[in-house]
Amino acid sequence: MSIKPPSALSELVEALRALPGVGPKSAQRIAYHLMQHDREGAERLGRSLLFATEHLRHCEKCNTFTEAQVCEVCCDPERDPTLLCVVETPADQIMLEQTMTYRGLYFVLMGRLSPLDGIGPKEIHFDRLVRRASDGIVKEVVLATNFTNEGEATAHYLGQTLKARGLAVTRLARGVPVGGELEYVDAGTIARAMLDRRTL
């Protein structure tokens, strides 16, 4: 007869498996570590997750995470409103900000096109992006999606649609490696890719 772990522990393992890159064994190791060695850390993690889910929302303008209706970047009068940079995730936005080479505004897709996974234009908030880019203020849209197959397909789809509306559309230069995700690329490489962006 095999021994089953307590249901509370099994639920914790299952919840941890929802995290990207965490499989069953990793989830089990994390759960046991938290319960054996870091209960205080586990409680802090639980409180932080609850606080984040209760207080974080999407910015009404750019779709990134914020605690207010409109994020700090969108409220910043020093930003250039004629430039709109499209990224896949808030983590990509933060990486671009760390380069200190871009002073425009953003739109965060919260994903990328992936028909096999059921992610189409609606899931990446395409209509909101088009409305934002077509506000009469934006002059250039910088496509900073990742250089993965899905990121390239997303950039192509967005580029074709936005160019048809008379907008100048540029793409980050290839300083970012093929298959590379912005979140994992150093700030210097991203800065060079932003400065050397090309017209689509």
UniProtKB/Swiss-Prot annotation:
One of its GO terms (molecular function) is DNA binding. This is Recombination protein RecR. Transmembrane segments: none annotated. Keywords: DNA damage, DNA recombination, DNA repair, Metal-binding, Zinc, Zinc-finger. Belongs to the RecR family. The keyword Protease does not apply. A zinc finger (C4-type) spans 59-74. Pfam families: RecR_C, RecR_HhH, RecR_ZnF, Toprim_4. May play a role in DNA repair. It seems to be involved in an RecBC-independent recombinational process of DNA repair. It may act with RecF and RecO. It comes from Burkholderia thailandensis (strain ATCC 700388 / DSM 13276 / CCUG 48851 / CIP 106301 / E264). CDD domains: TOPRIM_recR. Residues 82-177 form the Toprim domain. GO terms for biological process: DNA recombination; DNA repair.
